[in-house]
């Protein structure tokens, strides 16, 4: 347990940051799942729209260092390949 005022404040700040970062990580995963779901359903237009929104979300979260920039780039690349594959199949 934190004894000093400084340690108590840092514990409060850490809890607040953890909560905020968890919400952003959840948003990241949800955006990816939405695109994957549209691709699996074969909905080309919806997948393209969701991909555009997902890229914005992924970039924002990577800029805030919630996820590593390489993970963000890898996620975007895989989603782009899935959407492009859907367009090629159509």
From Swiss-Prot:
Region annotation (Disordered) ranges: 1-25
GO biological process per UniProt: translation
Example of a GO cellular component annotation carried by this entry: cytosol
Family annotation (InterPro entries): Ribosomal_bS20, Ribosomal_bS20_sf
Keyword Ribosomal protein in record: yes
Domain of life: Bacteria
SUPFAM superfamilies: Ribosomal protein S20
Cystine residue pairs: none
Molecular functions (GO terms): small ribosomal subunit rRNA binding; structural constituent of ribosome
UniProt KW keywords: Ribonucleoprotein, Ribosomal protein, RNA-binding, rRNA-binding
Role: Binds directly to 16S ribosomal RNA.
Official protein name in the record: Small ribosomal subunit protein bS20
Source organism of the structure: Burkholderia lata (strain ATCC 17760 / DSM 23089 / LMG 22485 / NCIMB 9086 / R18194 / 383)
Gene: rpsT
